[in-house]
Amino acid sequence: MHVSNVLGIENPVKELGRRVHEQGGYFVVDGAQSVPHVKVDVTEIGCDFLAFSAHKLFGPFGMGVLWGKDELLNAMPPMLTGCEIIYNVKKKDDKWANLP
């Protein structure tokens, strides 16, 4: 969690991310409370993924954003397919469309 919704404390995510990366892990930041109120620079934070919900930005419930580094997102196969997500279909080797 980047910022606490109870106390408003900004957690030391840059330091936490450094520690996670030292152990070979991926660093995922919950930006639900921070994104609507402060400028969040994912490069400065050093996170691999940042997630936040749309309703905190007066958007619809049930929607949100998952930002991720290109190389990590490209390594993940899509959970759902359709709507122009497949670039080329073959029997053994599908090619996914580029990230938006």
Task: Please identify what each model-predicted range represents.
Residues 1-100:
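Pyridoxal 5′-phosphate
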